[in-house]
């Protein structure tokens, strides 16, 4: 920044986050547990700069394929992975950048010589992907916990960083008023019926958003409210049992 003797740049692209995240998502979910550190390592330096989390044009050109093309699985699971990726980006601390075409799931990489493949919006799954992006952006704007404290641990706390065997992570996002969101990411196509996680406060934890919703093209498994219990989990005195849809962020 100029006030610190610099040239006036206030943000830096987090290329480490981008490289590690895309490398992780390109893995077959069966083997993601062996690459779990790609998810957690980025938080070791997340607050060393004012970062932007980029899913930019540079990753969808020159034979690299589109974001959708990088996702493993069949047609259904490619969309599930892409929704999870976009939600994971939004839930992590740092400002967001996403290149055009990502919002509706373009299959071909970007070609500067022609327009985007808008005809894909004639297909239901691409319409639902676009709707997901719209509602995800609105959810982000309406919940200050996701953007108000992006530069310190005051706005982010781990709940479960190392459940590598299940390929699950969970964390808290916190705003300046102390309001919180509890975020659970399931990086496998397996429904987790009774996942115990630590919780910071007593009460009922009610699902407010999930990428698995049927209206977004997901399986529509749903997540029931979870009641806290006086059962310690890791550093938390309380915990709760959560129902976590497959390949989703909730």
Protein language model regions, located:
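Short, well-ordered beta-to-alpha junction loops that form the rim of enzyme active sites
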Residues: 1, 55-58, 101-104
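Substrate-binding cleft/loops of secretory-pathway carbohydrate-active enzymes
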Residues: 1-31, 40-46, 107-110
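Short, charge-rich amphipathic segments
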Residues: 5-26, 55-75, 121-135
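Aromatic-lined glycan-binding groove of carbohydrate-active enzymes
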Residues: 28-68, 92
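Carbohydrate-interacting/catalytic domains
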Residues: 32-34, 63-64, 73-98, 102-250
């Amino acid at each position: 920044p100029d006030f610190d003797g610099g040239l006036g740049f206030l943000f830096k692209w987090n290329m480490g986050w981008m490289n590690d995240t895309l490398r992780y998502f390109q893995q077959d979910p069966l083997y993601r547990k062996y690459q779990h550190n790609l998810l957690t390592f980025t938080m070791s330096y997340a607050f060393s700069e004012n970062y932007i989390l980029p899913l930019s044009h540079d990753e969808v050109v020159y034979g690299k394929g589109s974001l959708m093309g990088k996702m493993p699985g069949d047609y259904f699971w490619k969309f599930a992975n892409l929704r999870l990726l976009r939600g994971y980006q939004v839930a992590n601390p740092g400002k967001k950048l996403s290149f055009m075409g990502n919002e509706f799931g373009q299959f071909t990489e970007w070609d500067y010589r022609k327009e985007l493949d808008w005809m894909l919006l004639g297909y239901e799954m691409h319409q639902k992907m676009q709707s997901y992006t719209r509602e995800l952006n609105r959810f982000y704007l309406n919940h200050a916990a996701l953007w108000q404290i992006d530069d310190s641990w005051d706005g982010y706390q781990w709940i479960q960083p190392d459940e590598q065997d299940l390929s699950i992570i969970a964390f808290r996002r916190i705003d300046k008023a102390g309001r919180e969101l509890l975020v659970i990411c399931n990086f496998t196509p397996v429904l987790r019926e009774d996942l115990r996680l630590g919780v910071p406060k007593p009460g009922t934890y009610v699902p407010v958003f999930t990428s698995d919703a049927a209206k977004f093209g997901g399986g529509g498994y749903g997540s029931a409210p979870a009641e806290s219990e006086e059962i310690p989990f890791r550093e938390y005195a309380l915990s709760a049992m959560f129902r976590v849809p497959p390949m989703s962020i909730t």
